[in-house]
């Protein structure tokens, strides 16, 4: 980080990160533009044991992120798409939260909570997800005594972000178009 930014208050740096992410969304290329910058395989990864979904099922994914995530094939396609955009951290966080809720042992739950926090929530985390300060603060307070619901608010925020941002981009992508053709 440059010395000028280091002198700014922490809240200013957080706000700058939020603005950077929002600007990134606004600066996305139009659908008709040709991707000449970073070539990538536009074919989705196909899960080894998943059956190819029917056209009707694939069309339902447009309407429901839940239906997409419940389908092994849809999940793998969505994950491949997010990887191609270097934005798979939201899905990885959501999955980590789902797995966290299944933990029964308080000791393992505390260990997993710490791991999720360090990987996705804390500032400058390797796969930091974009959540507001309020959500981050509530999540941190919930982790004082970890429970299966410690990450619920953050998970809901990330789910909403995927539903409003990632899902529409996926539906417009070549990944999805290949599935309906």
Curated annotation (Swiss-Prot):
One of its GO terms (biological process) is negative regulation of signal transduction. InterPro entries: RGS (IPR016137), RGS_RGS5 (IPR034956), RGS_sf (IPR036305), RGS_subdom1/3 (IPR024066), RGS_subdomain_2 (IPR044926). Keywords: Cytoplasm, Membrane, Signal transduction inhibitor. Signal peptide: none annotated. Residues 64-180 form the RGS domain. It is found in: Cytoplasm; Membrane. CDD domains: RGS_RGS5 (cd08717). It comes from the Eukaryota. One of its GO terms (cellular component) is cytosol. It holds the Pfam family RGS. Transmembrane segments: none annotated. PROSITE patterns: RGS (PS50132). Inhibits signal transduction by increasing the GTPase activity of G protein alpha subunits thereby driving them into their inactive GDP-bound form. Binds to G(i)-alpha and G(o)-alpha, but not to G(s)-alpha. This is Regulator of G-protein signaling 5. It comes from Rattus norvegicus (Rat). The gene is Rgs5.
